[in-house]
């Protein structure tokens, strides 16, 4: 195992070394992390990285296949957009742990902050302690296991995936409901806990999307061949895809805001108002 000292190297230099060592199949020990941000970001090799202390924001973000073991605490966004691989946090985690993971396994032995598993798509986020508010916020898939209490508004605006809670469910989020837990699901969770040597003998409650707020009054047609007015100027932004998108949104009266699936109504673009402005 090769040692990297963050008391001597910057995070940028350390991450370059981590990726180079990973390409050679070397496991890595990171000492004196001092809660520095972005440790291990971008690693895509099946090696083990041990962080001997606390890590800061977005540790193990944008990684694939690697396994991280963090001895103490971690800041916001641990495992951000992690594809496969794993992260084990021996202490607590800050807000949005497991944000947008796509298959990774993240285990937090302490408590975790708000909006855990936000927009996650696949994989498992497990918290041995308690969660803060809105765990599973807008999650699209995967599962969250909380062996402590859920925190308020668990499952807020989730569209898919499952949340399992052993402790108290403080309150359900918008469009979330509690449902029955199948025996196969229960067994699969216990096998996962055994894999990470987590002792658990209690029972679990299952939370899923209720399916009451996933429909708009007017559906957006999935059609590619849509006429639109062309733009004669010289602009890289005003391309055919943008024009098509604006045409679709003008028909349904709703335009998506980039980031986390938000939407807002289009303003009224009446002819009279346009003429008035021209005058």
Where are the regions a protein language model picked out?
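Detector for repetitive beta-architecture
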Residues: 27, 36, 46-48, 56, ...
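Structural recognition of beta-strand segments within beta-rich domains
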Residues: 50-51, 70
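Hydrophobic transmembrane alpha-helix bundles
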Residues: 67-69, 100, 119, 195-197, ...
């Amino acid at each position: 195992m090769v040692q990297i000292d963050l008391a001597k190297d910057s995070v940028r230099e350390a991450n370059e070394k981590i990726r180079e060592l990973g390409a050679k199949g070397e496991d890595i020990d990171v000492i004196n992390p001092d809660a520095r941000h972005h440790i291990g970001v971008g690693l895509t090799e099946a090696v083990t990285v041990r962080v001997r202390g606390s890590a800061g924001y977005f540790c193990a973000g944008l990684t694939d296949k690697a396994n991280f073991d963090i001895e103490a605490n971690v800041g916001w966004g641990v495992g951000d957009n992690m594809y496969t691989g794993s992260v084990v946090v021996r202490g607590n985690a800050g807000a949005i742990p497991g944000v947008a993971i796509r298959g990774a396994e993240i285990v937090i032995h302490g408590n975790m902050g708000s909006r855990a598993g936000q927009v996650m798509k696949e994989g498992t986020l497990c918290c041995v302690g308690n969660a803060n508010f809105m765990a599973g916020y807008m999650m699209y898939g995967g599962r969250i296991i909380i062996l402590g209490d859920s925190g308020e508004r668990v499952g807020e605006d989730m569209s898919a995936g499952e949340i399992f809670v052993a402790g108290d469910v403080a309150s359900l989020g918008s469009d979330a409901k509690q449902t029955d837990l199948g025996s196969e699901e229960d067994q699969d969770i216990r096998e996962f806990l055994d894999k990470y040597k987590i002792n658990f003998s209690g029972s679990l409650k299952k939370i899923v999307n209720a399916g009451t707020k996933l429909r708009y009054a007017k559906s957006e047609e999935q059609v590619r061949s849509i006429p639109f007015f062309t733009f004669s100027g010289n602009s890289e932004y005003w391309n055919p895809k943008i024009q098509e998108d604006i045409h679709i949104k003008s028909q349904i009266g709703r335009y998506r805001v980039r980031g986390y699936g938000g939407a807002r109504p289009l303003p009224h673009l009446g002819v009279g108002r346009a003429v008035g402005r021209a005058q």
